[in-house]
A protein has these predicted regions:
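Conserved ABC ATPase signature
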Residues: 134-138, 142
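The feature captures the beta-strand-to-loop junction immediately N-terminal to the Walker
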Residues: 37-39
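Conserved beta-strand-loop-alpha-helix hinge in the C-terminal portion
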Residues: 211-234
Length: 244
């Protein structure tokens, strides 16, 4: 069975020549919940963009067995959905229904299929009954859930999320963690919140200076005080308090 994501010796430089990612090699199995952790500017968000083909570098990226090329971006993006750092970037239609239906409509699904996809996605994220709400009237937590619904309606096998817990209060952050752990898709989550990462991930990948430092079981990596501090990261509270 193909891996969910395979990356081999991938590198990327910004237009000004600054190196953003260097020789990234990473294998991700289906069904995993991956936390990409590292200091600000480490390359986490850039790597998420590369996975979906929004930026192109050197090396190889394979998504669910499909090698990413300029000619198959549409196929690749049917397998991997992206939740951007600012959920409002994915909420641009008059109603929530329209936003969640946007992807399925562009896939060419008929009206009934679209309606079913929208209903299922909104139900999954806890926004049933809000289909006709204007997105700008939603709370921060609801906007984040809505942005996830716009991806779920496309039925991808893999979902990437860039700082999904940003701007959320503790209760909404806990609600989001519960939502994400209830999804069956492979999740790749870039976050600076170690407590949030520890609540969700079964696997952690530390990225620093555009390179993968280590990857492995989340509990082992995130409870390693020396390793975490060497890369400017805090050990999650659950390990400090002996809850793990």
């Amino acid at each position: 069975m193909a891996k969910a994501i395979q990356i081999e010796k991938f590198s990327y430089s910004y237009p000004d020549g600054t190196k953003a990612l260097s020789d990234i090699t990473l294998d991700i199995d289906h069904g995993r919940r991956i936390a990409l952790i590292g200091p600000n500017g480490a390359g986490k968000s850039t790597l998420l963009l590369a996975m979906a083909g929004f930026i192109r570098g050197t090396g190889t990226i394979i998504i669910d067995g499909l090698k990413l090329t300029n000619g198959n971006l549409k196929q690749v993006r049917s397998r991997i959905g992206c939740c951007l750092e600012n959920p409002e970037d994915q909420l641009f239609m008059p109603t929530l229904f329209d936003d969640v239906a946007f992807g399925p409509l562009n896939m060419g699904l008929d009206a009934e299929q679209v309606r079913q996809r929208v209903s299922a996605a909104l139900d999954k994220v806890g926004l049933s009954g809000m289909a006709q709400r204007a997105p700008h009237h939603l709370s921060a937590g609801q906007k984040r859930a809505a942005s996830i619904a716009t991806v779920l309606s496309m039925s991808p096998k893999i979902i990437t999320l860039d700082e999904p817990d940003g701007s959320l209060d503790p209760r909404r952050r806990d609600n989001l963690a519960s939502l994400l752990t209830g999804l069956s898709q492979t999740l790749v989550i870039a976050t600076c919140s170690m407590d949030f990462a520890a609540a969700i991930a079964d696997t952690a990948v530390i990225i620093d200076g555009g390179r993968v430092v280590t990857a492995g079981p989340a509990d082992e990596i995130m409870s390693d005080l020396k390793l975490m501090s060497n890369h400017g990261l805090e050990v999650p509270k659950k390990f400090i308090n002996g809850q793990a």
